[in-house]
Amino acid sequence: MYISKTIVFGLFVATLLVSCNADANTTQPLFPAILIFGDSTADTGNNNYYSQAVFKANHLPYGVDLPGHEANGRFSNGKLISDVISTKLNIKEFVPPFLQPNISDQDIVTGVCFASAGAGYDDETSLSSKAIPVSQQPSMFKNYIARLKGIVGDKKAMEIINNALVVISAGPNDFILNFYDIPIRRLEYPTIYGYQDFVLKRLDGFVRELYSLGCRNILVGGLPPMGCLPIQLTAKLRTILGICVEQENKDSILYNQKLVKKLPEIQASLPGSKFLYANVYDPVMDMIRNPSKYGFKETKKGCCGTGYLETSFLCTSLSKTCPNHSDHLFWDSIHPSEAAYKYLGNFIDAQIQEWLKT
């Protein structure tokens, strides 16, 4: 009888411990929803449903490493950084594009993407790419709010938006398309300094509009080392030596410094807001300088085609791809691979965790 009681007691304790451990491992989302704005680094497929858009990733080899091995509009071989962040925060594994026709109510409640490949803060940027400019993405957001209210009611909808994490990833297109490679804006802004200030002013107006619509927790991505993008090595005839365009990297650093200074100023003027600068420059540069640390063998060209020019409609199912997708920093001549996005996502997640402590 004594043995029987001991066994029963032991089973009870074991069951209790398993139950406690299960509860401990069930992490609640840190934010009720995630809302994504920006360009192709964040577009999870909106351009698929926007007929005017020039840049689309609705064909292989884009998406080749996603479940089902099918392209769905993401400019990479797999997940984007927004998907990685959403997963790390326990919100959901994939953030759907708002323009997707069959988007579910549950996806509306937990957040969607409004980004458009080819977009920038400067409306001029979208003229050639026919993308949805960052300045027009709040129009989609307003439609989203209306649908969200129809699902959960006005009060709950605003509660979700107030507490959601807003992620903004844009900027490189403005400088690459309008200042470096097609210098349209140089006529009005002869120096990079003036154009940087113009772009930041546009960013300022954009985040203030999001705030007026209820957004409070806003993460703003800085610029990567633009001079190291394969497309820029091609544009500046650096492909043979593989040397980054140092001046463009210096421009990225200066812009980021200005952004770091500006965000606290914006936050101070918007009661209840909380801004986070997402540093992408340093981790990407570290991947370039220390590739073996991340398992990369190639950091100067993309996996698709030659790696120096192909992107969007130039990177197709007819393009040869590198044998090992995960050993390339870049998937095409502009966009990082899923492997790189995972490292970046982990880096930014650590920033978010520290941000939440403040």
From Swiss-Prot:
Pfam families per UniProt: Lipase_GDSL
Keyword Transmembrane helix: no
Keywords: Glycoprotein, Hydrolase, Lipid degradation, Lipid metabolism, Secreted, Signal
Domain of life: Eukaryota
EC top class named in words: hydrolase
UniProt EC number: 3.1.1.-
UniProt xrefs under InterPro entries: GDSL (IPR001087), GDSL_lipolytic_enzyme (IPR050592), SGNH_hydro_sf (IPR036514), SGNH_plant_lipase-like (IPR035669)
GO process annotations (BP): lipid catabolic process
Keyword Cell membrane set for record: no
Cellular component, GO annotation: extracellular region
GO molecular function, one term: hydrolase activity, acting on ester bonds
Annotated compartments: Secreted
Active site residues per record: S40, D332, H335
Signal peptide: 1-22
Glycosylation sites: N25, N102, N324
Family note: Belongs to the 'GDSL' lipolytic enzyme family.
Protein name, entry field: GDSL esterase/lipase At2g30220
Provenance organism: Arabidopsis thaliana
Lineage: Eukaryota, Viridiplantae, Streptophyta, Embryophyta, Tracheophyta
